[in-house]
Structure formats: C-alpha cells, structure tokens
Amino acid sequence: MTLLPNERIDDLQFRGLKIIQNPQYFCFGMDAVLLSHFARLKKADRAADLGTGTGILPLLLWGRYEFRHMTGIEIQSNIADMASRSVSLNNLDEKITIINEDLRNFGFGSQAGTMDAVISNPP
C-alpha cells in the first residue's frame, strides 16, 4: 500500500480493519464511532454515506453489519483517494465504493431509489 507524505495507517482495533489518515487534513473522532453504533443496517442492505471523508463510517459499519454494498461520496479529491485506498487496504473493494463528486451534481443513476439507508456525519 502506497502512503503519501504525512499519511499513516491506523488500526481501528475492530475486526482487523485499518484506515489511512493524514493529520494535516482530518482524522476521524469519537462522533464517527458513536454514529456507527446508531446506524442499523442488514446484510442485504445497500447504503450511501454522504460526505464520507476518509471512509470511516463505511469501514466501521462494514465491521458491524457486513452489508451488501455502500457508496461513499466525497467532494475533496485527495480525501476521496485516501478513503479509496483504505477500502483497498481492507480488501473491501467489492463492498465499498468511494466516489469523488459534489453531492449537488451527483445522481445515483441506475441506483436511484435503491438505497436502504443513507448516512452522513455532518461537520
């Protein structure tokens, strides 16, 4: 796994999951961990994380529920790239997709109306 300058791999201490973070941008906090305990997903669920950031919610929720698929949408290209690499680091490319897009321009296309859950951790 290639790390960019100032990036690190943090062990989530949960089901062997790891995340790539860069303290010069943003590192997840307790709010993401707490939110992951409030969201309820089923194994067959398809979900979206709006403003996924580093991808912490999809990773934590995968660890809890092993959902069918989650799409994380992030506007910042460097953060979306970091989230995508975290997904790959955990071998979850078939379960979590990170899309670098502005939510105002994003259309779910053929996925429209097919999400079982939508989550977001507002700033």
Language-model-detected regions and their locations in the chain:
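Conserved SAM/SAH cofactor-binding pocket of Class I
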Residues: 38-123
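Class I SAM-dependent transferase core
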Residues: 2-43
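Accessory (non-catalytic) regions of SAM-dependent nucleic-acid methyltransferases
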Residues: 1-4, 54-56
